[in-house]
């Protein structure tokens, strides 16, 4: 999976001209990219130009919509459904059998053009192939990622550091409820890209 920024992007932003921290920055770029993707619940850029196949288990007889994991939705290649795990998938027709809601990244099962219909029930009863995300990491998110790299590179997560007889006290608490440890200004940006599971 692709990193959300590169070492050279970070070094240019921070105006770093030396190479002494390059190996640590390389590790942080990869680790923080994965951390941000995990926290946001989306890969953000990985499926913008390549297909993602997602299957859904439907257990409720009244379920007429499914929410896709990746966001924002770019395109839908195919929507398929099956009645049981032993059956083959049947390909559905757009705007006749299903409707794509790009604003909310969801697919509705429909019956014609005026009413909804429940999806078939069962394990992996719905399979959708689609593309979603961003062509490049959005600039505001990129800024938060740079700040996270600095946060870990300079070990700002440590409450207290001693160096050459001086003590540096970092404020590790946050004013945000249910804090997970990110500084407030970074968490606010990450939360704008967070996909919340509605299931």
Residue ranges and their predicted role:
Residues 1-199:
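Divalent metal-cofactor coordination and adjacent catalytic microenvironments
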């Amino acid at each position: 999976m692709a990193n959300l920024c590169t070492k050279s992007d970070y070094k240019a932003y921070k105006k770093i001209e030396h190479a002494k921290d390059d190996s640590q920055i390389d590790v942080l770029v990869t680790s923080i990219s994965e951390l941000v993707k995990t926290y946001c619940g989306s890969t953000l850029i990985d499926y913008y130009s390549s297909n993602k196949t997602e299957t859904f288990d439907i257990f409720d007889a009244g379920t007429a919509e499914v929410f896709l994991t990746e966001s924002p939705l770019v395109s839908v290649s195919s929507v398929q459904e099956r009645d049981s795990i032993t059956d083959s998938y049947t390909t559905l027709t757009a705007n006749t059998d299903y409707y794509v809601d790009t604003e909310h990244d969801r697919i509705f099962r429909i019956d014609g053009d005026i009413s909804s219909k429940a999806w078939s029930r069962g394990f992996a009863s719905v399979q959708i192939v689609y593309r979603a995300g961003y062509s490049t990491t959005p600039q505001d998110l990129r800024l938060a990622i740079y700040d996270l790299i600095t946060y870990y590179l300079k070990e700002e997560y440590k409450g207290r550091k001693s160096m050459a007889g001086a003590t540096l006290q970092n404020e590790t608490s946050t004013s945000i409820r249910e804090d997970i440890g990110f500084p407030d200004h970074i968490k606010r940006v990450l939360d704008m890209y967070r996909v919340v599971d509605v299931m």
